[in-house]
Amino acid sequence: MSRVCELTGAKANNGMAVSHSHIRTKKLQQVNLQKRRLWWEEGKKWVNIKISTKALKSIQKVGLDKFAKSNGVDLNKF
């Protein structure tokens, strides 16, 4: 099971951890993914989806259907 947002496609970022003595080591910054059961009004059904918290915040603002269409995601596959 990959750690990728199913709506936005957001995935892990490669970064650096920098110590006090400025020694840099590679670090993986994971996306904050949550499994959510959202009501899809147009389809009149519940949708189980794994999304990032950033996407969840956007869905609360614009709505699930509009957000999915803007990202080119078909909600019928969930």
UniProtKB/Swiss-Prot annotation:
Keywords annotated in UniProt: Ribonucleoprotein, Ribosomal protein
InterPro entries, alphabetized: Ribosomal_bL28, Ribosomal_bL28/bL31-like_sf, Ribosomal_bL28_bact-type, Ribosomal_bL28_sf
Gene Ontology annotations for the cellular component aspect, listed alphabetically: ribonucleoprotein complex; ribosome
One Pfam family named in its UniProt record: Ribosomal_L28
GO terms of biological process kind: translation
Family: Belongs to the bacterial ribosomal protein bL28 family.
Name of the featured protein: Large ribosomal subunit protein bL28
Organism field: Prochlorococcus marinus (strain MIT 9301)
